[in-house]
């Protein structure tokens, strides 16, 4: 009976399989590790085509993390999936305001979503932030409105909400306006796991 594979061996083998299955598809070298990390997380090769990067987005995200920026997520799941040990070693932390009672109360009073209010709360943070949005398109819409009003300047927007209502439009708005560097999963696919995977792909390039 052969010995069970170690986690690192499993990951290395998985990435080798991904590379093999991608075949002769050409990925931009600066984006390749992000794309493969997302495929590794989802087993979905569509992301090789649907992930859209603004020029130098990966380099800008890595530079921001090296500078000690924080990460803001729209779900506790995304927050849980991000490698906080590496992030903390760089001087950053992860924030998610979605579950804060005062955010829920304000959203109810104003008749807007908690995601919308949570982005307003995040805009008050006193340091650069990467915004990793994997669930709520209204978070992206809120971010776009805040950027238009010069109330927030994201170091990077990871726009990968999943679903059917406002999802595609919110992503395209981030791409079309191009007010901040972005990594966006075009179409309906995405999710908190994808948002966390992209954050980790950037962090692992710093600590590999």
Locations of the language-model features?
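N-terminal glycine-rich anion-binding loops that anchor highly charged ligand groups
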Residues: 26-40
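Buried hydrophobic positions in well-ordered alpha/beta secondary-structure cores of metabolic enzymes
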Residues: 74, 157-159, 198
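Charged, compositionally biased N-terminal leader segments and the immediate start
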Residues: 1-29
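Long, charge-dense
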Residues: 87-125
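Short glycine/serine/threonine-rich phosphate/pyrophosphate-binding segments
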Residues: 78-81, 138-143, 164-168, 191-195
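A short, well-structured juxtamembrane/interface segment
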Residues: 49-64
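Feature captures the catalytic cores and cofactor-binding loops of soluble hydro-lyases/lyases
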Residues: 125, 139-157, 166-169
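C-terminal functional extensions of proteins
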Residues: 165-208
């Amino acid at each position: 009976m052969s010995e069970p594979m170690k986690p690192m061996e499993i990951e290395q083998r998985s990435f080798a399989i991904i590379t093999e299955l991608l075949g002769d598809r050409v990925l931009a070298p600066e984006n390749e590790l992000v794309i493969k990390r997302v495929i590794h997380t989802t087993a979905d090769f569509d992301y090789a085509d649907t992930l859209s990067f603004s020029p130098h987005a990966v380099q800008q995200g890595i530079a921001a993390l090296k500078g000690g920026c924080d990460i803001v997520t729209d779900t506790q799941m995304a927050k849980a999936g991000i490698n906080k040990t590496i992030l903390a070693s760089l001087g950053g932390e992860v924030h998610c305001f979605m579950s804060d009672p005062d955010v829920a109360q304000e959203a109810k009073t104003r008749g807007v979503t908690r995601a919308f209010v949570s982005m307003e709360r995040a805009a008050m943070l006193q340091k650069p932030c990467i915004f990793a949005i994997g669930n709520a398109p209204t978070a992206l819409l809120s971010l776009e409105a805040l950027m238009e009003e010069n109330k927030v300047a994201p170091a990077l927007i990871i726009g990968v909400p999943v679903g059917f209502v406002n999802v595609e439009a919110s992503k395209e708005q981030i791409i079309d306006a191009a007010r901040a560097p972005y990594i966006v999963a075009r179409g309906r696919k995405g999710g908190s796991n994808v948002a966390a995977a992209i954050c980790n792909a950037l962090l692992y390039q710093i600590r590999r």
